[in-house]
Structure formats: structure tokens, C-alpha cells
From Swiss-Prot:
Pfam families per record: HSP70 (PF00012)
One of the GO biological process terms: regulation of transcription by RNA polymerase II
Protein name: Transcriptional coregulator SSA1
Molecular-function GO terms, alphabetical: ATP binding; ATP-dependent protein folding chaperone; transcription coregulator activity
InterPro entries, A to Z: ATPase_NBD, Heat_shock_70_CS, HSP70_C_sf, HSP70_peptide-bd_sf, Hsp_70_fam
Keywords associated with the record: ATP-binding, Nucleotide-binding, Nucleus, Stress response, Transcription, Transcription regulation
Organism: Cryptococcus neoformans var. grubii serotype A (strain H99 / ATCC 208821 / CBS 10515 / FGSC 9487) (Filobasidiella neoformans var. grubii)
PANTHER family: HEAT SHOCK PROTEIN 70KDA
Biased amino acid composition, Gly residues: 609-629
SUPFAM superfamilies xrefs: Actin-like ATPase domain, Heat shock protein 70kD (HSP70), C-terminal subdomain, Heat shock protein 70kD (HSP70), peptide-binding domain
Organism taxonomic ancestry: Eukaryota, Fungi, Dikarya, Basidiomycota, Agaricomycotina
Length: 643
């Protein structure tokens, strides 16, 4: 049985891990990298995912999609979505109130939901794990930012379903990182641990109490729209202005130039974590102008000052909510690539009176590590290390219903341990009211208009009665994934109605998921067909060139007519290869057969002559046959295969 894996589906990079031989193994991808860019690219002939997609982004900016996590489970008119669209070269459109991504693939216009793009990244992670484990992977624990709301969690679960994964559990990233930190520290007594998780696109802070394998989250806070990408944006804007000052030209209209600049900025940002200054050199950036400049760490810190400082607010909120004071926090653990920034480390350290944060876990891999441990537990692993492990997580936001006057009445308060169930009795607002509309919201504000509507449903058929008499019991049930189910019942008639908050505006239906799953299979088949075509082309090319080498190395050993016939055919094939850019696998195979039909009799005659040539030692020219045949053997199909 192939194991369940843990997947950290990140904004900018993703990572997959598995529990095996009593420990976690982080699985490297086909490029040997332990994290994979969350990028998907489309072009005229194929779809690329991961490193291959990110590597070609400057050549194909409009059809390379990234940051899907910043769109998933959101509404098109969200302020963050609108702001992000200014930075993205790919086109985001409004599809019944939800954002969708429009690209050109194989010469056709295609529209994908953020769930589909995320599912493609998940498929890549699934395939990475399958290559390593040598079997089909169908079960996974997928992580989300702790501060993701209900719609974002549900959409992430849908992405898993489209990727053909049974998502055993959605767990919070900081909680997963806490497992990575605390797994081997079971016997150290009770500890209060603060996880500070700043990644490529999201930011979470969670405070946990860890004792004897029980990980209890006390409070969580964060910003689902703050991370390394935002620091890159500040650098990009800074250099666009500098380029404008120096050259009186605005490069922001050119997607390719912007992308090249962004890649350089990301590299510069990383360098500034270990160096005080770095230079940027981009040849022919825009209108043939080379852009050479430099930036200091101090300037970078100044450009991002407000963003860096804003990371302290959730830390304070978590301390307040958990009623634990700074001095009682035993460890501060940094997670996420952006915590490598020295200024961030200093702010965290200053916040806790100069205490050094704990750096014992890998900030890029900790989340996938914890997810893999949870996957092992959920599939019944009996290893001693995972035996007594218990996760108690919390709901990040209050959830409740709208009552008269647009008031938000929370049933489940934020930071309540999940799974949880809570019921309250409500009544009608006017006499003889036949039904009630139950509107479910999440958020911390007093008025529902300032909160996020999760969904609504009607409870009808209430018998006529004066206001305040009917008793309507509303129960909220939050499962272990942090996803909400709501039930309302009229106590006098026993009539009830319930919904899983599928955010009727935001959630994909079962049919849509099935359609997307079928499409994902189709894309996979297309990807495989494209790979087979490339293989057929490469096979033909290497066969033709190996024949060419044999012909030129042994010109005097061939019959002159044979030499001319075969040379002519080989040259003809090589020149047609240059023009066959969009040929099919069958065309390449047909051409190979044609070439073999001409080559085989001539090569058989040639090897026969080499083997039986008179004079000298037995076997004719020592090594001649071998030398002539070697290229064909090593590079293409061997000549002996076809009679």
C-alpha cells in the first residue's frame, strides 16, 4: 500500500513529504529540488508545471500563471484581488463574481478557475511523490494558512479533489510547523511556543501549548495577503521609478521587461539577507537599454518598512487572545522563506526583549514535514514517534448569523478549539412570520455588512404565531478541517433545513469538480502525448546523426553508390526535421521507418564487409565494425533490431 503524503501548497513554492521508516522524508522533484515553484504555464504545444514553468516565464508572461493561492476562495471584487491584478501579467476575469484566469493554450483561449490551477500544482506534487514511492498516491493532508476563511479552505479541498486526491484533512500551516518543531520534544514538559510563519504570500502567527505530544493551539492571527511577493513588488516599483528617472521611459507597460526585473528583484532580496549590498544587471531590459544598478539592505528595509512592522500586530493579538504574556513564551519558531530577512528576525527578537528565535527547523520544509506526520497518523501509522500525538486546532474567525438590525451574533467565537458544535435558540421578528432567512457570516465586526457572508438558506413552514414565540434552534458544527455545517430547526414542528457552508456564491458543485477532474485527466493525456512526440523526434534525430557520423568516419569503406544513397537520405531527413516543428509522433516514426528501410540493407552490407574483410588479423580491421556501429548503438535504435 502506498502511503499518504503531506503537501504544503504554497503561494510561491510547494513541498511534499512522506512518513517512512519512522521519519519524515522530504521528496525532491525531477530537477532535484526539494521545493517546487507553484507555477503553471501554457504554450502552443504543451502545459508546464513547476520549475519548467517558472524558467520560461519571461518568454511567456501572459500564459504563465502563479499566485493562484491569492485568488482561491476569494471574490472578484475583493480589494486584494483588484490590487494584485495590477502586478500580474496574466489576465484575470470576472466569472459570476469569482476570479478566473484566461490563457492561450494550443492556440485556443482557455479559462481556468484558481482551484484548477492549484490542482495542477497538486498533481505535480502527487507525481513527484509517486516517482519516489513507486506507486499511486491517492491520499494527502494539505495545508492552508491558519487565517484562511471557510471559502478558502473549501476551495483548497476542491483543488485536491480535482487533482484526484482524497484530502484526508486540511491543516493549518503554523500547526504543521509546530509538529515539525515539537515531534522529538515530547518529554520536555509543557511549553508555550509561538510560530511566526511568513511565506511567499501569506502570514500567520499561532501560539500553541505543547505537552507530551498534545499540540493545543491557544490563538491564531495573521494576514492572508502578506508575504515575500509584496516585498518583491516594493523593489519592482522602486526600480521602475529609477529606470524612469534615468531613461525617461516607463517599462511598466512591457510584461516581459517587468518579469525580468521581478526575477532580478527576487534574487536581490535573497542576496540582501546575507549581504549588505547587491547589484542588479539586466542587459537590454527595455527599448534596448541596459539596466545596471545596486541596492543596499538599508534601502530595501526602508522600502518595506510598513510591511515589516505590520507583522508585529498579529503577534500582539495572539498574545492578547491567548492571555499569555511575552515572558511566558518559551520558544519563538520562525517558518517560511521570508523569515530569513534579518530585519524580520530583529523585529521578532526585539518584540520578545532581545530573545533569539529558534532556528532548529528548515523554514521551507517544516510545514510539509508536519503535514506528512499528520497524514501518517490519519492513515493509522503505529510508529512510536507518532503514537500519542494529538492536534487541537482552533477556528481563526468568529462564525455566527445575522439577527434583526444587521447585527452579527456569533455562535462560535474565534480561537474556539475545533471540531466543535454550538447551538442557540432564536425567534421570529414579526407576528405570523412564515419563515426565516438564516444568513451565516464570519468575522469580528459588530455589523454583518462588515463581515464575510458564507452562505444563506431559508427555514419555511413556521406555524403562525406572535413574534418571539416560535423557537428556532440554530446549530453550528465546525469539523476538523475548519469547515462549517449549519442546521436550523423549528422546535414546534421539528422541520429543519441544513447546509454545509458551501458558500453558494463561491463553491464548486460536485458536477463542476467531476468535470474538472475529467479535464485534468485529458490534460495529463495531452502532456504524455507531447512527451512521446518529443521522444520520437529525439530518437529519429539521434539515429540520423549517428548514421551521418558513421558515413563520414568510414567513407572509404562503403560502396560509393551506397554511400551516396544513404548520405542523401540522411541529409534529407535532417533537413526535414528542422521544418517539422509541429509534426505528430506518427510522422516522426514514419520518417524513421523510411530511413531504416534505406539504411538497414546498406549498414548490414557494411558490417558484413567489416567482419569478413581479407588481410590482417581475423575479424578484419580491428575495431572498425565496432567503431562504426557504436554511435548507432549508443544514441538511437540499434541497427540489428530490424531485419
Amino acid at each position: 500500500m502506498v502511503k499518504a503524503v503531506g503537501i504544503d501548497l504554497g503561494t510561491t513554492y510547494s513541498c511534499v513529504a512522506v512518513w517512512q521508516n519512522d521519519r519524515v522524508e522530504i521528496i525532491a522533484n525531477d530537477q532535484g529540488n526539494r521545493t517546487t515553484p507553484s507555477y503553471v504555464a501554457f504554450n502552443d504545444s504543451e502545459r508546464l508545471i513547476g520549475d519548467a514553468a517558472k524558467n520560461q516565464v519571461a518568454m511567456n508572461p501572459y500564459n504563465t500563471v502563479f499566485d493562484a493561492k491569492r485568488l482561491i476562495g476569494r471574490k472578484f471584487e475583493d480589494a486584494e484581488v483588484q490590487a494584485d491584478m495590477k502586478h500580474w501579467p496574466f489576465k484575470v476575469i470576472d466569472r459570476s463574481g469569482k476570479p478566473a484566469i484566461q490563457v492561450e493554450y494550443r492556440g485556443e483561449e482557455k479559462i481556468f478557475t484558481p482551484e484548477e490551477i492549484s490542482s495542477m500544482v497538486l498533481i505535480k506534487m502527487k507525481e513527484t511523490a509517486e516517482a519516489y514511492l513507486g506507486g499511486t498516491v491517492s491520499k494527502a493532508v494539505v495545508t492552508v494558512p491558519a487565517y484562511f476563511n471557510d471559502s478558502q479552505r473549501q476551495a483548497t479541498k476542491d483543488a485536491g479533489a480535482i487533482a484526484g486526491l482524497d484530502v484526508l484533512r486540511i491543516i493549518n500551516e503554523p500547526t504543521a510547523a509546530a509538529i515539525a518543531y515539537g515531534l522529538d520534544k515530547k518529554s520536555e514538559g509543557e511549553k508555550n511556543v509561538l510560530i511566526f510563519d511568513l511565506g511567499g504570500g501569506t502570514f500567520d502567527v499561532s501560539l500553541l501549548t505543547i505537552e507530551e505530544g498534545i499540540f493545543e493551539v491557544k490563538a491564531t492571527a495573521g494576514d492572508t495577503h502578506l508575504g515575500g511577493e509584496d516585498f518583491d513588488n516594493r523593489l519592482v516599483n522602486h526600480f521602475v521609478q529609477e529606470f524612469k528617472r534615468k531613461n525617461k521611459k516607463d517599462l511598466s507597460s512591457n510584461a516581459r521587461a517587468l518579469r525580468r526585473l521581478r526575477t532580478a528583484c527576487e534574487r536581490a532580496k535573497r542576496t540582501l539577507s546575507s549581504a549588505a549590498q547587491t547589484s542588479i544587471e539586466i542587459d537590454s531590459l527595455f527599448d534596448g537599454i541596459d539596466f545596471y544598478t545596486s541596492i543596499t539592505r538599508a534601502r530595501f528595509e526602508e522600502l518595506c518598512q510598513d510591511l515589516f512592522r505590520s507583522t508585529m500586530d498579529p503577534v500582539e493579538k495572539v498574545l492578547r487572545d491567548s492571555k499569555i504574556d511575552k515572558s511566558s513564551v518559551n520558544e519563538i519558531v520562525l517558518v517560511g522563506g521570508s523569515t530569513r530577512i534579518p530585519k524580520i528576525q530583529k523585529l521578532v527578537s526585539d518584540m520578545f526583549s532581545g530573545r533569539e528565535p529558534n532556528r532548529s527547523i528548515n523554514p521551507d520544509e517544516a510545514v510539509a514535514y508536519g503535514a506528512a506526520v499528520q497524514a501518517a497518523i490519519l492513515t493509522g501509522d503505529t510508529s512510536e514517534a507518532t503514537q500519542d500525538l494529538l492536534l487541537l486546532d482552533v477556528a481563526p474567525l468568529s462564525m455566527g448569523i445575522e439577527t434583526a438590525g444587521g447585527i452579527m451574533t456569533p455562535l462560535i467565537k474565534r480561537n474556539t478549539t475545533v471540531p466543535t458544535k454550538k447551538s442557540e435558540v432564536f425567534s421570529t421578528y414579526s407576528d405570523n412570520q412564515p419563515g426565516v432567512l438564516i444568513q451565516v457570516f464570519e468575522g469580528e465586526r459588530a455589523k454583518t455588512k462588515d463581515c464575510n457572508l458564507l452562505g444563506k438558506f431559508d427555514l419555511s413552514g413556521i406555524p403562525p404565531a406572535p413574534r418571539g414565540v416560535p423557537q428556532i434552534e440554530v446549530s453550528f458544527d465546525v469539523d476538523a478541517n475548519g469547515i462549517l455545517n449549519v442546521n436550523a430547526a423549528d422546535k414546534s414542528t421539528g422541520k429543519s433545513n441544513k447546509i454545509t457552508i458551501t458558500n453558494d456564491k463561491g463553491r464548486l458543485s460536485k458536477e463542476e469538480i467531476e468535470r474538472m477532474l475529467a479535464e485534468a485527466e485529458k490534460f495529463k493525456a495531452e502532456d504524455e502525448a507531447a512527451a512521446a512526440t518529443v521522444q520520437a523526434k529525439n530518437g529519429l534525430e539521434s539515429y540520423a546523426y549517428s548514421l551521418k557520423t558513421t558515413l563520414s568516419d568510414n567513407q572509404d569503406k562503403f560502396d560509393s553508390a551506397d554511400h551516396e544513397t544513404l548520405s542523401k537520405k540522411v541529409d534529407e531527413v535532417i533537413s526535414s526535421l528542422d521544418t517539422m516543428q509541429s509534426a505528430s509522433k506518427e510522422e516522426f516514426e514514419g520518417l524513421q521507418k523510411e530511413l531504416e528501410a534505406v539504411a538497414n540493407p546498406i549498414m548490414t552490407k557494411f558490417y558484413g564487409a567489416q567482419g569478413g574483410a581479407p588481410g590482417g588479423a581475423p575479424g578484419g580491421f580491428p575495431g572498425a565494425g565496432g567503431a562504426g556501429g557504436a554511435p548507432a548503438h549508443e544514441e538511437g535504435p540499434s541497427v540489428e533490431e530490424v531485419d
